[in-house]
């Protein structure tokens, strides 16, 4: 079964390396770079989702999707619109709607960062702003209950910005399992790759 791991906006596909290295050998795990999927199209959320749908269309069997932060949002959007193509869903530190106050603060901070500071992020400075602005009104509150596949909701104990959303998903997605990872912040795949690998391995083993 093909698994696709999607990174967050502040990181790149390589952020999954340590987690994947500690999962069972032979696991078919893809980790696309979200910016590369756009192929120079305008950095908007609808374009990103369309590009990801094209990427997923290459697979003949249902997919196991796992995403962190922005990656979780993209995975969730795909699962809602292509339910027949998704076997399972893992959402890590994923917001169920864009928090307006936090978004405004993040934009303020980003505005004063030099372009060079974005080199290790998923998108450059201009695309980060463009993508963020296209997601201002994003809200999955009314559709979370439509997710019908087995779903695992994960959130770091110290990721206070997303704990409420994790609990929302756990309460509203019918087949959701929920786990808070102790002592960990937002970037779970880099802060606790071994622990995350164990959790994911157990989740996927239960599906087989």
What residue spans do the PLM features occupy?
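Catalytic histidine-centered segment of alpha/beta-hydrolase-like enzymes
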Residues: 184-193
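Flexible "cap/lid" loop of the alpha/beta hydrolase fold
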Residues: 45, 76, 80-81, 89-115
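Active-site loop/oxyanion-hole signature of alpha/beta-hydrolase fold enzymes
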Residues: 17-21, 28-64, 198
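Short beta-strand/loop motif that positions the catalytic acidic residue
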Residues: 146-147, 153-155
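Conserved alpha/beta-hydrolase "acid-adjacent" motif
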Residues: 160-165
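Gly/Ala-rich beta-loop-alpha elbow adjacent to hydrolase catalytic centers
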Residues: 67-71, 75
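Hydrophobic, aromatic-rich cap/lid helix
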Residues: 116-140, 157-158
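Serine-hydrolase catalytic-loop signature spanning alpha/beta hydrolases and amidase-signature enzymes
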Residues: 10-18
């Amino acid at each position: 079964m093909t698994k696709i791991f999607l990174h967050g906006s502040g990181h790149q596909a390589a952020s999954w390396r340590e987690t994947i290295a500690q999962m069972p050998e032979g696991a078919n795990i893809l980790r696309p770079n979200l910016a590369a999927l756009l192929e120079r199209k305008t950095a908007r959320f609808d374009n990103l989702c369309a590009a990801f749908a094209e990427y997923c269309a290459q697979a003949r069997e249902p997919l196991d999707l796992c995403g962190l932060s922005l990656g979780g949002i993209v995975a969730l959007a795909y699962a809602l619109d292509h339910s027949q193509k998704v076997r399972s869903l893992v959402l890590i530190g994923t917001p169920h709607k864009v928090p307006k106050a936090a978004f405004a603060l993040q934009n303020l901070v980003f505005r004063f960062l030099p372009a060079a500071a974005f080199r290790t992020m998923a998108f450059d400075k201009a695309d980060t702003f463009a993508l963020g602005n296209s997601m201002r009104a994003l809200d999955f509150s009314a559709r979370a209950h439509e997710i019908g596949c087995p779903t695992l909701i994960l959130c770091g104990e110290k990721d206070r910005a997303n704990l409420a959303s994790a609990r929302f998903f756990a309460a509203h997605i019918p087949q959701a399992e929920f786990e808070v990872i102790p002592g960990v912040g937002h970037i779970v795949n880099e802060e606790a790759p071994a622990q995350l690998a164990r959790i994911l391995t157990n989740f996927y083993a239960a599906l087989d």
